[in-house]
């Protein structure tokens, strides 16, 4: 498997629960390195741009409203098979369907307030990383 980078966002619900460190521990325990990170409070424009792929979906407005409801923690994870590994750590989008021990099963409340976002493919990972960390804000470790 190749070394990959993927974007991860700890969403407002998980930030409010003060579980950033617990989630970071899961990334690192799984062999993922955090090569860039920042806390931000997304503007409506940023959230709309980032989730633009969903703009025609019925949940788009609620998603944007949720993502701007409080600060988020944004990080780039790097490691062998980082995209799939992060998605396994996150668990199913709906925490009720997520396997026990996954981030969403342990820290999410609903399909809307589901604790984390993770890139789903190498192409989207590259776009998402560049969206939040343009240029030289990501470092090899």
UniProtKB/Swiss-Prot annotation:
GO MF term list: ATP binding; metal ion binding; nucleoside diphosphate kinase activity
EC number assigned by the record: 2.7.4.6
Family as reported in the entry's similarity comment: Belongs to the NDK family.
Gene Ontology CC entries for this record: cytoplasm
Subcellular location: Cytoplasm
Protein name: Nucleoside diphosphate kinase
Function of the molecule: Major role in the synthesis of nucleoside triphosphates other than ATP. The ATP gamma phosphate is transferred to the NDP beta phosphate via a ping-pong mechanism, using a phosphorylated active-site intermediate.
SMART domains for the chain: NDK
Signal peptide start and end residues: none
Active-site annotation: 117 (pros-phosphohistidine intermediate)
Binding, ATP: 11, 59, 87, 93, 104, 114
Taxonomic superkingdom: Bacteria
UniProt keyword annotations, A-Z: ATP-binding, Cytoplasm, Kinase, Magnesium, Metal-binding, Nucleotide metabolism, Nucleotide-binding, Phosphoprotein, Transferase
Reported cofactor(s): Mg(2+)
GO biological process: CTP biosynthetic process; GTP biosynthetic process; UTP biosynthetic process
Quaternary structure annotation from Swiss-Prot or TrEMBL: Homotetramer.
Catalytic activity, reaction form: a 2'-deoxyribonucleoside 5'-diphosphate + ATP = a 2'-deoxyribonucleoside 5'-triphosphate + ADP; a ribonucleoside 5'-diphosphate + ATP = a ribonucleoside 5'-triphosphate + ADP
Origin species: Polynucleobacter necessarius subsp. necessarius (strain STIR1)
PROSITE patterns: NDPK, NDPK_LIKE
